[in-house]
């Protein structure tokens, strides 16, 4: 089982798909990485040689932010927005949609379950 960026890649999947198990790598980045490493997209994870795994590791470490580093960067940028007092930071703090969506109706995922209003019944 190949272990890249602290993630165990599944054995029986194609490398193009297996790399997407790493946070921060989607299908497009996976294809770019495999092209740079000169590995076929259809190669299964368990068919890789150690040299090929090391090539993928070095490409990811050198060119891409993944896993913990990416998560930390995202949370730090959100924290920066909150500290500066930007509108987007306030929306993050209140748990509301950040990108201008309507909130009168909808936005239930971001706002959470409905809260009952006491004293509304007659």
UniProtKB/Swiss-Prot annotation:
Keywords: Ribonucleoprotein, Ribosomal protein, RNA-binding, rRNA-binding, tRNA-binding
GO molecular function: rRNA binding; structural constituent of ribosome; tRNA binding
One GO cellular component term: cytosol
Coiled-coil stretches: none
Domain of life: Bacteria
Signal sequence bounds: none
Region named Disordered: 94-122
Annotated Gene3D superfamilies: 1.10.8.50, 30s ribosomal protein s13, domain 2
An individual GO BP term: translation
Oligomer status and interactors: Part of the 30S ribosomal subunit. Forms a loose heterodimer with protein S19. Forms two bridges to the 50S subunit in the 70S ribosome.
Similarity section: Belongs to the universal ribosomal protein uS13 family.
Role description: Located at the top of the head of the 30S subunit, it contacts several helices of the 16S rRNA. In the 70S ribosome it contacts the 23S rRNA (bridge B1a) and protein L5 of the 50S subunit (bridge B1b), connecting the 2 subunits; these bridges are implicated in subunit movement. Contacts the tRNAs in the A and P-sites.
Name of this chain's protein: Small ribosomal subunit protein uS13
Annotated organism of origin: Syntrophus aciditrophicus (strain SB)
């Amino acid at each position: 089982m190949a272990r890249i960026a602290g993630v165990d890649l599944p054995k029986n999947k194609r490398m193009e798909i297996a790399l997407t198990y790493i946070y921060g790598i989607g299908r497009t980045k996976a294809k770019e990485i495999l092209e740079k490493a000169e590995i076929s997209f259809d190669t299964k994870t368990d068919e890789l040689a150690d040299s090929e795994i090391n090539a993928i590791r070095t490409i990811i470490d050198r060119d891409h932010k993944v896993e913990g580093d990416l998560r930390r960067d995202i949370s730090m940028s959100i924290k920066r927005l909150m500290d500066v007092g930007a509108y987007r930071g306030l929306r993050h703090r209140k748990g509301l949609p950040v990108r201008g969506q309507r909130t009168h109706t909808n936005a239930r995922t971001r706002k959470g379950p409905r809260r009952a209003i006491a004293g509304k019944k007659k």
